C-alpha cells in the first residue's frame, strides 16, 4: 500500500511539474520584461547577483527583507561554475523566475509530508486522499499563479511550511531558524513562527486539560450557566499559568521561538517599524472586515467542505436555538463593518487586480451589500470553525489569534495575504472524502485555467501608456 502511495505521489508531482514547466514557458514568452511588483524585485535581485549588496543599491520602494534575493543568488550563481554560463544568463529574468518554480516543487513535497504528520493515521485516511489533498493544495489558484512570477509567495510558503513541519516533529531549533528564513521573505511570517510556538503550548495545554477532565473529583467547583465551559477553561488556564513548573517546561520547549521573538522586537526598534522602504502605503490599522473577507475567501475555495445542506441545516438550528447570541454577533459584526471598513488607495488605483473589480463593481456600487453579507460572513466563520472541531480547543485558539494578528492590521484588501492562513487551515481539517477532493481539484483546475487564460490572452493598455497590462490576482 505504501509503495502504491509512493507511485501515486511521484506521478502527481511529475505531472504537476510538467504542466508548470509548460505554463512557465508560456509566461516567459508573454512576459519579456518585469511585470507589476517584479519591477522592484527583479532589478534588486540582479544587483545582488552582480555582487552589489550595499545599502546604497537598495530600492527604497521594496518593503520586504531580501530573503528572496539572497536565496535566488545562492541557487543561480553556482550555475556559472557548474555549467560555465555567463552572468547575463544566470541573472536573467527567466532564471530568477525559475527559482519560484523550484520552490513550488519543494512546497508540493512539504504539503505531502505535512498531511502525513498532521492527519491522524487511521484506515479511513487512504493514500489517494493524502495524495489528492496534496495535489489540490499545490495548485491552489492564488498560490499557484505566483509560482510563475518573481514574487515572495512561493519562498515564503516554503520556509513557513518547513518550519511548521519541523515544529510538528519536535525539532524546535530548526523550526525557529526556518521561521527566521520565512521572516526574511515577508515580515508578517513572524506570526507563523509564533504559531509554531503556540502549537507546542497548545499540545501541552491539551494534555493537561485532558488530565483535568479525567479526574474523578474536580478541584474546581461545578459551574453552571451559558458560558460554563468557557469559564471552566479560563479557570484552568489561570491555574496552569500560575505554576512555575508549567511555565519553566513551556520555556524549555519554546526558547528558540522566544529568542526569535526578541530578534524580531530588536528589528522593529532599530528599523522604527515592521515595514522597510516605502511605509506610507503600508500603515497598520484595525481593519476588522479583513476577517470577513478571509472567511468569504475560504468559503469560496473550500465550498465542497464548508457548504452543504447538512451544514446549513445545522447552522440554522443553532441560530434558532441561540437566537440572542446570533443577534449580538450580527450587531457587533455590522458595527465593525460600519466603522472599520477601509479602501486602500492601491485598491482603487490599479485595475489590473481582481480585487479592484470586486470592490468597485460590488461593494462600492451597492453600499448596503456589505451589511447584507454579514449573516453570510457569520456562517462562513462558523463553518470554518466547525470544520476544525477535530483539533483541540487550544490549537483553535492559537490559530485564530494568529489569523487575527496577520490579517486585521492590513489596510489593503489583497488575496495574497490570505494564502498562508488558508493553507494552514486546509492542512488541519479532517481529510475529506475522495469525491469532495475531486470536486475541489476540478474547481481549482477550472479557476486556474480561466485566470491563466485571461492573464496571457486578455491584455489591455492604459490611455497614457504603451505598456501591455494584464489581469491577475
Swiss-Prot record:
The keyword Endoplasmic reticulum applies. The keyword Cytoplasm does not apply. It is an enzyme of class 2 (transferase). GO terms for cellular component: endoplasmic reticulum; endoplasmic reticulum membrane; lumenal side of endoplasmic reticulum membrane; plasma membrane. It holds the Pfam family DIE2_ALG10. It is a multi-pass membrane protein. It catalyses: an alpha-D-Glc-(1->3)-alpha-D-Glc-(1->3)-alpha-D-Man-(1->2)-alpha-D-Man-(1->2)-alpha-D-Man-(1->3)-[alpha-D-Man-(1->2)-alpha-D-Man-(1->3)-[alpha-D-Man-(1->2)-alpha-D-Man-(1->6)]-alpha-D-Man-(1->6)]-beta-D-Man-(1->4)-beta-D-GlcNAc-(1->4)-alpha-D-GlcNAc-diphospho-di-trans,poly-cis-dolichol + a di-trans,poly-cis-dolichyl beta-D-glucosyl phosphate = a alpha-D-Glc-(1->2)-alpha-D-Glc-(1->3)-alpha-D-Glc-(1->3)-alpha-D-Man-(1->2)-alpha-D-Man-(1->2)-alpha-D-Man-(1->3)-[alpha-D-Man-(1->2)-alpha-D-Man-(1->3)-[alpha-D-Man-(1->2)-alpha-D-Man-(1->6)]-alpha-D-Man-(1->6)]-beta-D-Man-(1->4)-beta-D-GlcNAc-(1->4)-alpha-D-GlcNAc-diphospho-di-trans,poly-cis-dolichol + a di-trans,poly-cis-dolichyl phosphate + H(+). Residues 1-6, 86-97, 148-150, 197-256, 305-317, 387-392, 458-473 are cytoplasmic. Residues 28-64, 119-126, 172-175, 278-283, 339-365, 414-436 are extracellular. It is found in: Endoplasmic reticulum membrane. GO terms for biological process: dolichol-linked oligosaccharide biosynthetic process; protein N-linked glycosylation. Pathway: Protein modification; protein glycosylation. Signal peptide: none annotated. Disulfide bonds: none annotated. Interacts with KCNH1; may regulate KCNH1, possibly by regulating its N-glycosylation. Interacts with KCNH2; may reduce KCNH2 sensitivity to classic proarrhythmic drug blockade, possibly by regulating its N-glycosylation. Dol-P-Glc:Glc(2)Man(9)GlcNAc(2)-PP-Dol alpha-1,2-glucosyltransferase that operates in the biosynthetic pathway of dolichol-linked oligosaccharides, the glycan precursors employed in protein asparagine (N)-glycosylation. The assembly of dolichol-linked oligosaccharides begins on the cytosolic side of the endoplasmic reticulum membrane and finishes in its lumen. The sequential addition of sugars to dolichol pyrophosphate produces dolichol-linked oligosaccharides containing fourteen sugars, including two GlcNAcs, nine mannoses and three glucoses. This is Dol-P-Glc:Glc(2)Man(9)GlcNAc(2)-PP-Dol alpha-1,2-glucosyltransferase. It comes from Homo sapiens (Human). The lineage of its organism: Eukaryota, Metazoa, Chordata, Craniata, Vertebrata. The gene is ALG10B.
Amino acid at each position: 500500500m505504501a509503495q502504491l502511495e509512493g507511485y501515486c505521489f511521484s506521478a502527481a508531482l511529475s505531472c504537476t511539474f510538467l504542466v508548470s514547466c509548460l505554463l512557465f514557458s508560456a509566461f516567459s514568452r508573454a512576459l519579456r520584461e518585469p511585470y507589476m511588483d517584479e519591477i522592484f524585485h527583479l532589478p534588486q535581485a540582479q544587483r545582488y547577483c552582480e555582487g552589489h549588496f550595499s545599502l546604497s543599491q537598495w530600492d527604497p520602494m521594496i518593503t520586504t527583507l531580501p530573503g528572496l534575493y539572497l536565496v535566488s543568488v545562492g541557487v543561480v550563481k553556482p550555475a556559472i561554475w557548474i555549467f560555465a554560463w555567463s552572468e547575463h544568463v544566470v541573472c536573467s529574468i527567466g532564471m530568477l523566475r525559475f527559482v519560484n518554480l523550484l520552490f513550488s516543487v519543494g512546497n508540493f513535497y512539504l504539503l505531502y509530508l505535512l498531511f502525513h504528520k498532521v492527519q491522524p493515521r487511521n484506515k479511513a485516511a487512504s493514500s489517494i486522499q493524502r495524495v489528492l489533498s496534496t495535489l489540490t493544495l499545490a495548485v491552489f489558484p492564488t498560490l499557484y499563479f505566483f509560482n510563475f512570477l518573481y514574487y515572495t509567495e512561493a519562498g515564503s510558503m516554503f520556509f513557513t511550511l518547513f518550519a511548521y513541519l519541523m515544529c510538528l516533529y519536535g525539532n524546535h531549533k530548526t523550526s525557529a531558524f526556518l521561521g527566521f528564513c520565512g521572516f526574511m521573505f515577508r515580515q508578517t511570517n513572524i506570526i507563523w513562527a509564533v504559531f509554531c510556538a503556540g502549537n507546542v503550548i497548545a499540545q501541552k495545554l491539551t494534555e493537561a486539560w485532558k488530565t483535568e477532565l479525567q479526574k474523578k473529583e474536580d478541584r474546581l467547583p461545578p459551574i453552571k450557566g451559558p458560558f460554563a465551559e468557557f469559564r471552566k477553561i479560563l479557570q484552568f488556564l489561570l491555574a496552569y499559568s500560575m505554576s512555575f513548573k508549567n511555565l519553566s517546561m513551556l520555556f524549555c520547549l519554546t526558547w528558540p521561538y522566544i529568542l526569535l521573538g526578541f530578534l524580531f522586537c530588536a528589528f522593529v526598534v532599530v528599523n522604527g517599524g515592521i515595514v522597510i522602504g516605502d511605509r506610507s502605503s503600508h500603515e497598520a490599522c484595525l481593519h476588522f472586515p479583513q476577517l470577513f473577507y478571509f472567511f468569504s475567501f475560504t468559503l469560496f475555495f473550500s465550498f465542497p467542505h464548508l457548504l452543504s445542506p447538512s451544514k446549513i441545516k445545522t447552522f440554522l438550528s443553532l441560530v434558532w436555538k441561540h437566537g440572542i447570541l446570533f443577534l449580538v454577533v450580527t450587531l457587533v459584526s455590522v458595527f465593525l463593518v460600519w466603522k472599520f471598513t477601509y479602501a486602500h488607495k492601491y485598491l482603487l488605483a490599479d485595475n489590473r487586480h481582481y480585487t479592484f473589480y470586486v470592490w468597485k463593481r460590488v461593494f462600492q456600487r451597492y453600499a448596503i451589500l456589505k451589511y447584507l453579507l454579514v449573516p453570510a460572513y457569520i456562517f462562513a466563520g462558523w463553518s470554518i470553525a466547525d470544520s476544525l472541531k477535530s483539533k483541540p480547543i487550544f490549537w483553535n485558539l492559537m490559530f485564530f489569534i494568529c489569523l487575527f494578528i496577520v490579517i486585521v492590521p492590513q489596510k489593503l484588501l489583497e488575496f495574497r495575504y490570505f494564502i498562508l492562513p488558508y493553507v494552514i487551515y486546509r492542512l488541519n481539517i479532517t481529510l475529506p472524502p475522495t469525491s469532495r477532493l475531486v470536486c475541489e481539484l476540478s474547481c481549482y483546475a477550472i479557476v486556474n485555467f480561466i485566470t491563466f487564460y485571461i492573464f496571457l490572452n486578455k491584455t489591455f493598455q492604459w490611455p497614457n501608456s504603451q505598456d501591455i497590462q494584464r489581469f491577475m490576482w
